[in-house]
Amino acid sequence: MRFLSFLIFVFAVLGLVQAQDQSGFISLDCGLVPTEITYVEKSTNITYRSDATYIDSGVPGKINEVYRTQFQQQIWALRSFPEGQRNCYNFSLTAKRKYLIRGTFIYGNYDGLNQLPSFDLYIGPNKWTSVSIPGVRNGSVSEMIHVLRQDHLQICLVKTGETTPFISSLELRPLNNNTYVTKSGSLIVVARLYFSPTPPFLRYDEDVHDRIWIPFLDNKNSLLSTELSVDTSNFYNVPQTVAKTAAVPLNATQPLKINWSLDDITSQSYIYMHFAEIENLEANETREFNITYNGGENWFSYFRPPKFRITTVYNPAAVSSLDGNFNFTFSMTGNSTHPPLINGLEIYQVLELPQLDTYQDEVSAMMNIKTIYGLSKRSSWQGDPCAPELYRWEGLNCSYPNFAPPQIISLNLSGSNLSGTITSDISKLTHLRELDLSNNDLSGDIPFVFSDMKNLTLINLSGNKNLNRSVPETLQKRIDNKSLTLIRDETGKNSTNVVAIAASVASVFAVLVILAIVFVVIRKKQRTNEASGPRSFTTGTVKSDARSSSSSIITKERKFTYSEVLKMTKNFERVLGKGGFGTVYHGNLDDTQVAVKMLSHSSAQGYKEFKAEVELLLRVHHRHLVGLVGYCDDGDNLALIYEYMEKGDLRENMSGKHSVNVLSWETRMQIAVEAAQGLEYLHNGCRPPMVHRDVKPTNILLNERSQAKLADFGLSRSFPVDGESHVMTVVAGTPGYLDPEYYRTNWLSEKSDVYSFGVVLLEIVTNQPVMNKNRERPHINEWVMFMLTNGDIKSIVDPKLNEDYDTNGVWKVVELALACVNPSSSRRPTMPHVVMELNECLALEIERKQGSQATYIKESVEFSPSSASDFSPLAR
């Protein structure tokens, strides 16, 4: 299938259609002049307007007149970009809304060079696709489904070689947020088919969302159609023509087969199949079939299309194929009297968008600064100010923290011919550390809001002769306490300020040099001491028989005697908890609260776990791993001393045992993100990598600020650093959270932790126990999948939340969790991917709490019961 190639034919002149509502449509005829006009394209009845208000660069042009009669009017003009490497369209939209975005590129020898262009297309800071024009009269269409992360969107054309980027039309169509849901990334269209041997191609207004449908019917199938109306009112709103036609096998006793292939065998796909029974079956007649994938994997069992009503079946988690081939077989069951059918098929490829946008407020501020000071002609000031780093705006420095948006940390507009007052928009750059506005023609007062910019340490306003020299009182206080340096011109009695500041900076620099020298000397001595005697673990003699096969722990750091443990716990006065390892007590050490875990006098395995935990915690440090304060290895007395986590474990907080306050959805997402970051650090930040092996809510502890930290590393195992992805080990863990593949094979990998974490995510969403024999499906994984067959997310969400959450965000978490608990470890995501997804879910909730204008439809789609296989589709 070459769907995008077929799309070019759609832009040929079609028959007239009737008008429908185009609310929310953005239809741009790129390069249209005069820019103020709009027109209605006759063959589609879509209203187009110029792109001029969405972009401030580029040159209008028109395709050669000889080609114009072959295409719809919005293709005749175009905009090319001979200047600058990146040129971007800017849209102000609503965050979290879902859009179909389509760019069309018809060369038509507009420049008379007969030179076929190639360039890249970006969505925000991420590459969307490479555009290569196949012929003078041909072109390219790029289409994707994308959820906005912020309330602005940039679509950029990036020059990659000697040819000039251009664009013919750009179209945005709002979609229902409950449709085309992914665990991550956006969707690029591979094919959108309805089953007919002949045209027409379908788009608006037959498709209210202006999706483009291509007719398709191969010689192994025949056409089934009806003149009766079909109910298409589920979330996907397929056109009537799609619903009223279907493909069935030529031989009614044979299965229906649909095959396609993708060039990129690593790509992930989502498949949407639309079904409706369009024959009037008698009472003793049945159409029932199974859907299998690539030779036997069950996709859907005993499926019966509803009578004259569309139902959509899709995979809740992306699928891939080892060789890039996708083969679907629709086979009659033994109960069926009629062959299988299918009415419509949509195939999408996942486009991951790993690069986060710069903070929204900072982007808005920079756009305002660009407009206020007339900086639109700066060729690099296009698109996202910081991302990707290769295209960062000239004059900016940015920081790029892990799993967080880029931040603008310095702005240099020195000598930029700025005039007028200093805009207060600069104060919205909350991460800004240095601001240079020197050598311009700025006037007016120094904004008092600069004093509220807590990260700002340097302001250079020198060379602005018309700027008011008075300094706001609040800003002067920061200058006086040395938290901010202000460089400005002075006259008269204050003329020495710049010199004084320069001298002060020089003095500080000299002190820093001296301190650096002292630090190097001290550090050198420390290394000499370390070289003379290691302060880690060494082999020694063990007194207890229970430890006869293990080394003792000998270190000079963090080691306490048993009497010191008695003192810090006041003779074990207050019990915090009990477990198989022993008892945890409250303690105080140097006026700091601690938790003391005393190991019971038991087996050699207990000591091994104790030793493993000490060894791990002495060498790993992360803000989301419980910190080890020290340990006791005194005769038969073994203890671990941890930082005290005031709010106890996650299970206690979810159940209400620790507090009557219900954990909000935002807090739950924050806890999930932080626990995932701790786990991701064990997998990727440690050398050698570590597997926790016992991830569960009771091992996720919360401090007084509800910050989450992973605890209990007694079962943790390390991996060799030679590329091994798994090790064979005796199965250990907690029933209900144990990876079934690990249990079956004894092969342990990081994906075993991913499985356990997926179970924890389901508990966070549902507040249900992992095992409950009174449920129809005892294990929480099976119960969630069973409950979601009706597409109603509310049926599983913790009722204590009182529906105070973003439904789309909950769906994303549940689908991520179900991907984590996939029985096959190879199909589970990695922890970095989990962290990225959860960060997006947290951002959705934070934006909702801050008053986002986005609205979502919460109804669910009716859906036939599915089997509980790996690929059971979810409905919504």
From Swiss-Prot:
Topology Cytoplasmic: residue spans: 522-872
Protein name: Probable LRR receptor-like protein kinase At1g51890
A Pfam family hit: LRR_1
List of glycosylated residues: 45, 90, 138, 177, 251, 259, 284, 290, 327, 335, 397, 412, 417, 455, 460, 468, 481, 494
Enzyme class: transferase
Membrane-spanning segments: 501-521
EC number(s) on file: 2.7.11.1
Topology term for the membrane: Single-pass type I membrane protein
The keyword Iron-sulfur appears for this protein: no
Subcellular location: Cell membrane
Record's note on what induces expression: Transiently by pathogenic bacteria Pseudomonas syringae. Faster level reduction following induction by treatment with the virulent compatible DC3000 strain than with avirulent incompatible strains.
Originating species: Arabidopsis thaliana (Mouse-ear cress)
Gene3D superfamilies the UniProt entry points to: Phosphorylase Kinase, domain 1, Ribonuclease Inhibitor, Transferase(Phosphotransferase) domain 1
Modification Phosphotyrosine occurs at: Y642, Y742
